[in-house]
Structures are given as structure tokens and as C-alpha cells.
Design a protein with these regions (language model features):
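Phosphate/NTP-binding elements of NTP-utilizing enzymes
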Residues: 1-269
Length: 269
């Protein structure tokens, strides 16, 4: 697995991996002995909020950018504003890290942001609307907060990207990866809901790995001990005292609380 190198990358970025992040990195980075490159071409990650998902995405993107020359890494968010905020936070972290010498000066102009590295690779943030239906050459791309997509938009993105993956695999020798990451959404999150429901029913494609962190269906999201037991970052990024503060922020919004910290879908009932 490539997980050990991802872990070292995280340390050099100044954000050592939490146990759950290392587990995901180890599995997602498994190497196919028949090809010598990544076994999985698709990684689906469903997590509660406040768990360090963004840190893992940034670490995986950085590792992928440094895998070889002229690699193309894209981070997709619901809007351009969301993507660019995430990108600016990452660039700031990178600039202060031990990996800064490998990075060139970032381009921060609106609509044209990218972080290039000395080897010619780049990481670029985009709004999903800029990508849907368009084939883009890429080595790794992440659809973050996938709950925001309806089924048609999500499939348009995947259908546009899939043909380019074989081209890049042939050109670089490294299996491209699509990452789909999100907290559970609502009944309107038809793209993500379809994926998760299919996986939970046991219909997981051979080259897809998926991770589903959250409270069990029969658990009480108002029980703090339940949240502490099942949230992958409990006691690591925050404690029970902070959990009480988080709950107060969701006063009068029980479904929003269960969704954010239990990763439970809000079906509006």
C-alpha cells in the first residue's frame, strides 16, 4: 500500500494522520501486484463533520502531485467559492510546511487558481458546474460535499471523466483515482444517496473502496456517548465539552445535528 508514504506526507504538511485517516489511506492506496499501481480507481468516503476529512483530501492530493511529473489533480466543490476557500486554506498550510520547497508560488486569481510543484504537477480547485459533461484530463479528482449533487449532475461528471482515466493510465503508468467524499445529505441528495444505498446493499464494484463512518441506524443521536463512540475524531480533534458546544449550535435542529455529527441522512420526516 501507498499508505505509509501518504502518512509521511501528512507529517511533512504538519498534520499527522489520525487512525481513521491512516486506515483510509492504507486501503485506498493498496497496490495491485499485477500492475504495480493503485488497485482502486474509485474511493467513496462518507463521514460526519469535524473529523478531518479536508486534511486527508489535501494530503492525498499532495502525495499524488508528487508521484511523478506533470500530474493533474482537481478538487471539486459545490461552488467555486467553496472550492477556492478550501484551496486557500491548503495553500497556506503547504507554504508553512516542510514540503514548501517543492511548491512553486500559487496562482490565486479568481477562476484560475492552482498550486504548481517543481515537477510540473498541479492541484486546481473547480466548481462542479465547470466540470459536468466535460472530459478533463486528470490523475486524481475529488468531488467533495457530494450531497449537494443531484443524480444527473453527478453522473454527468463521472461520465465525462471516466474516458480520460484510461488515457492517463496509459500515459503515466499510474491508475487515476476518483474520490467522492461527503457527509450524508437529505432526500434531495440523489447522487450520493444512490451510491451509498447501493453499497450498503452489497453492490460494490470490484475496483471501488468505500468507507462509511457514523452512528448505527438504531442509535440515539442525542446520546453524547453514542456520538463519542462512533465519531472517528472524537477525543482526538475535540472532546465531550466541545461536543456540548457543538450541540448548542444546532438548537432546534435535531435532524441537522444527527446529520452533522452522526452522519445520518435527513429524510425530512
Amino acid at each position: 500500500t501507498d499508505g505509509e508514504i501518504v502518512s509521511r506526507t501528512a507529517g511533512m504538511l504538519g498534520k499527522p494522520l489520525l487512525p481513521w485517516q491512516r486506515y483510509v489511506a492504507d486501503v485506498a492506496g493498496e497496490i495491485d501486484p499485477a500492475t504495480g499501481t493503485y488497485y482502486y480507481d474509485r474511493v467513496v468516503l462518507s463521514t460526519p463533520r469535524q473529523c478531518g476529512k479536508s486534511t486527508l483530501i489535501d494530503t492525498e492530493d499532495t502525495r499524488n502531485a508528487l508521484l511523478g511529473p506533470d500530474r493533474k489533480i482537481y478538487y471539486l466543490a459545490q461552488t467555486g467559492k467553496d472550492a477556492e476557500k478550501h484551496f486557500k486554506d491548503f495553500v497556506q498550510q503547504l507554504s508553512k510546511s516542510k514540503l514548501a520547497p517543492f511548491a512553486l508560488k500559487p496562482r490565486l486569481s479568481n477562476g484560475g487558481m492552482e498550486q504548481r510543484f517543481g515537477n510540473g504537477s498541479f492541484i486546481c480547485p473547480l466548481a462542479v458546474t465547470k466540470v459536468a459533461g466535460h472530459g478533463t484530463q486528470m490523475d486524481k479528482f475529488t468531488i467533495d460535499e457530494a450531497f449537494s449533487l443531484d443524480d444527473e449532475t453527478g453522473k454527468l461528471i463521472l461520465d465525462g471523466m471516466a474516458p480520460t482515466m484510461n488515457t492517463r493510465l496509459h500515459f503515466t503508468g499510474v491508475q487515476p483515482q476518483i474520490w467522492i467524499t461527503s457527509t450524508e445529505g437529505t432526500a434531495d441528495s440523489t447522487f450520493l444517496n444512490g451510491l451509498l444505498d447501493s453499497f450498503r446493499a452489497g453492490n460494490v464494484p470490484t475496483r471501488t473502496c468505500w468507507f462509511d463512518f457514523g452512528i448505527p441506524d438504531d442509535a440515539d443521536p442525542e446520546d453524547f456517548q453514542t456520538i463519542l463512540k462512533w465519531h472517528p475524531a472524537a477525543g482526538l480533534l475535540w472532546d465531550v465539552r466541545q461536543l456540548r458546544d457543538f450541540r448548542e449550535q444546532f438548537a432546534g435542529n435535531e435532524a441537522g445535528w444527527a446529520r452533522a455529527f452522526g452522519n445520518r441522512r435527513d429524510n425530512g420526516v
